[in-house]
Structures are given as structure tokens and as C-alpha cells.
Amino acid sequence: MLKRHAYDQLLNWKNRKTKQGLLITGARQVGKTTLIEQFGADHYEHVAKVNFIEMPQAVETVSKAKDTEDLILRLSVLSGTEITPGKTLLFLDEMQACEDMLTWTKFLSGAKGLDVIVSGSLLGIDVFNVRSIPVGFLQTMRMYPLNFYEFCAACRLPQPALDTLRECYVDRREVPDYL
């Protein structure tokens, strides 16, 4: 996997223990899903993922939940993973397809103490259709395409070469042609 600066932001969110869910937005194809899945695999025993576009039946299933316990059971069935606070990352992908789910995150992350990450490429536009945005219960993060440094690292440019590039930029010198 590519080393992304956003990974460190995910780690900071996890370590802060604020009982806040994390909302990750960004353009399509910038690596949101891949990053979250890798983070979950690295730091949790289980990742319970529900993608509301790939699983259209999930929207109806979630909308019929009576309370938080019922919702957790439904999400567990949809993801095929037991959801346990402290051991499971609940990853709700393409949230723009299920407006009610954003409201539920308040209860999942706050009262139930679950680590919840919600993501979607069009979420920033569609979030305004939600009845009750959980103010104070969601930390937000915007993800961007690779920056230049991440790109160079992905191309396996050695650290001394990256340092040389940085020095050339700071000193406004020409970059050596071998770089």
C-alpha cells in the first residue's frame, strides 16, 4: 500500500478516544476506501464494512432499525462481522446513499463507544439532506489525491533523493537531471 499522510490522521483519531466518529470526504478515486481498509486491518481485530452503493438492500435494512442495539445487529449481519467496541472498526462506505445512517453515528460512536468511520465521495454535497447532523459527534477529514512527496515515495525514490529535492526547492536551485 502507498504511504499516505492521511494514515497518520486516522491514527491520531483512534488514539484520541473522543467517542467521535470520523467522517472522511474527498473526490472519487483518491484512495479513501483502500486507506480505511488498511488502517482497520492494521489496528483492529475486525473490520465491519457496509458499502451502501454496493449493497442497496442495506439502506432499507438500516432504515427499519428500532434502536441502537437493533441497528448494530443489522450492521453485523450486513457486514458478516461481529461488532464489538474496542475490537471492531465499523466502516460505513458511500454514506451518501443512506442519509439516516449519518444520524445514527452519534449513538454508535458516543453511547456505544464504537470506532466508526463513515466515507463517501459525494458526501459533502448530500450531507445537507440529512435530518439531524450529529454535531460534536463527528470529526471530519478531507482526503486529497497524492501530493508530490507521496508520489515520489510511491515511486520508491530513496530518502536522500527526496531530501535533495526538498533542498533544491528551498534553495531555489535546479534539480539534478538524474532525479
Please report, for each region that a protein language model flagged, where it lies by residue.
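Pre-Walker A adenine-sensing motif
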Residues: M1-K17
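Hydrophobic anchor at the beta1->P-loop junction of P-loop NTPases
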Residues: I24
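Conserved lysine of the Walker
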Residues: K32
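Hydrophobic positions on the alpha1 helix immediately C-terminal to the Walker A/P-loop
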Residues: L35, F39
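Short glycine-rich substrate-engagement loop in P-loop NTPases that contacts/grips substrate
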Residues: E54-G86
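Structural recognition of the conserved hydrophobic beta-strand(s) that form the central parallel beta-sheet
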Residues: F91, D115-S121, R142, F151
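Sensor-1/coupling segment of RecA-like P-loop NTPase cores
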Residues: G110-R131
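Interdomain motor-coupling "hinge/lid" segment immediately C-terminal to the ATP-binding subdomain
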Residues: V127-L179
